[in-house]
Amino acid sequence: MIKSFFLAQFISILFTVLIFPQQVLIRGKVTDGATGQPLSFANIRISETLTGTAANIDGGFELKVLKGSYKIIASYIGYYSDTLTINTNSQINNLNFELRQTEVVLPEIVVNPGVNPALEIIRKAIEKKNSGKSLLKSSEVQAYTKGIIRTTEDITSNDNSIGVGVGGSDTTELIISGILENHSKNYFKEPDKYKSIIIARKQSANIPPDINILTGGRLLQNFYENDLNFLGKDLPSPVSDNALDYYYYRIESTAYKNSQKIYNIYIEPNLSSDPGFTGSIFIADSTFELIKVDLILNRAANTGGVFDTVNVFQQFDEFSGIQLPIDYRLFVKANLFGLVRIGFELNTILFNYKINQELSDDIFNKAILTVLPDADDKDSSYWIATPTIPNTSEEQAAYTRIDSLERVPWNFWDNFLLLSTGINLNKNISVSSPLSLYHFSRVEGHSLDFGIFANDLLKKRFNSALKLSYGFSDKKFKQDFTAGYLLGDYRTWEIKLNIFNKLKVLFEDSDNYGELLSTLVTLISKDEFRDYYYSKGFAFEVEGELFPVLKVRTGFSNKTDNSAFVNTNFSFFNRDKEYKNNPSVFPSKINTINIGFDIDFRDYIEDGYFRRRTSLGRSFVLFSGDIYYSDKNFLASDLNFKIYEFKSRVFIRTLKSASLNISLYTRYTDGTTAYQDLYSLPGNIDVVFNSETFRTLNLNEAAGDKIFTLNLTHNFRDELFRLLNVPLIKNYEIMFSLIFNMALSDLNESTKQISPHFVKTFKHPFYELGFGIGQGIIPFKIEFMWKLNYRDGNNFRVGLNMPLL
C-alpha cells in the first residue's frame, strides 16, 4: 500500500507537468486604494473553490489556474474586499487590487466593575475552536514554503552544516544570504496523525538540500491548537482551553472586513515571568472565529534573551465550515553574545484544501516527513506550474549574487580557521587543522598527528578516515583507518571496516574528555588522568534497519593488546615531579563475534538522504543490546567469554519544559575478561564533570565484568522557581537539576586471577546524590554531589559540567 501511495504521488506530479501548457499564471498586487501602500500578506481566494494564496510582504501574489473564467477575491482586515472577474486565456501580469479602508473604531464599551468585555469574546472563541475541531476528521493541503536567512555577510556551507561569520557592527545591515523553497502535501487524520511529503525543493547554491525540510505540516504551528512549542517550551495558545487563566486580554479596537466586525484584542501573560505570547489577535464578531494572530514571544519564553524578536503571524479562513490556517509567517532576529547577528524569515502559504475525505492509514507511518527521491530534480517548468510566493526584488538579487559567488573556484584560505578541528579541501575532503596536529602523553611524549577525512562521497554513501600519528618518546608510528558504505534509499544499512595499530586509552568508553584537555592538563600539572595500552587488529561490522523501529548488527573483530610504559618526564612545570606509572594490561589476542540490536520507537524525518530520528520534544524510550562471543577453540582466541550488554535511555517530559532523563546500563560476563576489556564506572577529574557519570568517583576508580548502573537527572530548568514563585530568582532563568546515580560492580573469579591489578568493586549498591545550578544562556553549570555510602576521603565534590570539554 505504501508503494502504491508513492506511485500515486509520482503519477500526480507527472500529470501536473503534462498539463502545464494549459495552466495560466496570474500575477498581481494588493494595495491601499488611498495611499498606494502594499497590504502585506493580503488574502487572495478564488470564489466558490478551496483554492487561494496570500501576498508577500510587498503585497505581490501569484496564482496558477487552468484556462477559464474566475472570480478572484482580495481581502484584508480593515478593508472592504474586492472581487475581479477574469478570463484566463493567457498570462496576466497586473491583476491589481486597490482596497478601500473601512472605519476603524476605538471601543466605546460600558465596563461594569470587575468585568472585562474581552473575556467573554475569548470564552466564545474557545468554544468555537473546540466545536470546529470536532468537525475536522481529516484534511489534505498543499503548502509552499520559503525560508530567508539574513546575516551581516554571505554564509558558507558544506553538506552537513552552515557557517556564519562572526563580528560586525550592531548597525550593519543584514543581507539575504540564503533562500530555501519547497512544495509539499500535508495530511492529517484524527486524533493526532500527521504526514508531510515534500514533492519539490530548491535553494540558493550555498544551502545543502537536506537542510531544506521546513514545510507546512506538523513542523509548523497552528494557533487553533491548545499548546504551541517554541524554543523547547510548550506555550498556551491565545485560545487554548486554559487561556483565560493564563493571559490578560484587552480590546484595542474594532475594524471591519466588509460588513463583518473584527475585534483587535491585545494579549499578554498574566504574569510577566510566565512564558507566552504578547501582541494582537483578531476575532470575528458574532461567529467568534479566530481569523488572524500577530504575536511575539515574551522575554520569559526567550531563554537567555538570545533572540531580539520572535514574531509569528498567521491567518485563517473558512473551509467547509471549519477555520483552517491559510498561511504561517515567522520572523526571527538574534544577536548571539554580540558576536553573530542573524535573521530568519519563514513564509508558508497553504492551498487546495481537501476536507474530511477518506485517507488511508498507510499514509501515516513512522516517517512524519518524507522528501521524495526526485524532489531535488524538479526543473523550472515545475515551479512555473506550482503556486508560490513571488520573489521580491531583494530576493531575486540575492539569488543572483549567491549563485555567482558559489561559482567562484574553491579557495583553501577562505575555509581556513585556526581554531577548527579540520580544514576543508573541498566539500567532501578535509584534513587535520593546526589545532589537531599535536598531542602529548607520558607514553608517547610529543606526538605529531595528521588525518585525512572523506565525508558524504558517492551520493552521501561513503565515509572514510585515515589518522596517522608518531610519538617521539615511544618512537612508534600509529595508524587508524575507518571506512563505511551506506546502502538503501535512505542509507539505513552500513558496512563498516576499521583497521588499526595505535595507542588506545584504557577504558576509553568511560572517558568523555577531549584530547586537548588531556594534553593541557598533562603538560601543565603533570597529573595525567588517562592510562594507555597498545592495540592492533581490525573490525568488520554490518548494521541496518530490519524494521522501522528495529536496527540489527553483527560483526567480527580481531585485536592484539600489549602494555604501554612511561617514556618521558617532560612537562612545562613541576619538572622534578615524576609521572605516575602507566598500568600494565593483560597481553592477549582476542577474536570476537558480536550481534546486537537497537529499538527506537521515535518517528523520523526522511530528508531525501537519511532518516533523522526526532521525538519533537516529546517523551521517548530507547533500548539496545549486544552479545560478544570469544572462544579459544572456535575463534583461536586467548580467552573464553560471553558478554551480554543491555542499555536503555528514557526521556520523560514532566513539568512544562522540565524533563527526566534516565540511563540504565547492565553487563553480565560468563567467562574470563582481560583487564583492559573490563567496564569502568564513568568517573571524573577533580573539578570538570560530565553528564551521566559518577561525580564523586575518579576516572577508572571502580570497574568490573558484572555491572549495573542507573543515572537519573531531572532537569527542572527554571520551571521549579517559577512554580514556587520565588522572588527575584524566578526572573533570572536559574536552571536547577537534581542528580542521582547508583552502581553495582563485581568480578568473576577467573578474571581476578589474570588481572595484573587490584580492581575496586561495589558488591553492594553505591549511591550518590546532588544538584546542579546554571543560567539559561551560560553553557555550563555548577554541580554539587555527595556520596551516600562507601564514604571515604572524597565524599563531596563541586565541579563544572562543561559539555565543550
PLM region descriptions:
Residues 22, 28-39:
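Structural motif
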Residues 235, 368-470, 474-805:
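Exposed, low-structure sequence patches enriched in small/polar residues
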Residues 53-54, 80-94:
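Structured interaction patches on ligand/partner-binding surfaces of diverse proteins
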Residues 103, 108, 112-262, 268-276, ...:
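Structured extracytoplasmic
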Residues 46-48, 73-84:
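A short, solvent-exposed loop/turn motif at the edges and junctions
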Residues 87-113:
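Extracellular beta-sheet/turn segments enriched in Thr/Pro/Gly and aliphatic residues
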Residues 36-40, 62-69:
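Short Pro-Gly-centered beta-turn/loop motif in secreted/extracellular proteins
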Residues 49-60:
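Short, acidic Ser/Thr/Gly-rich low-complexity loop/linker segments typical of extracellular
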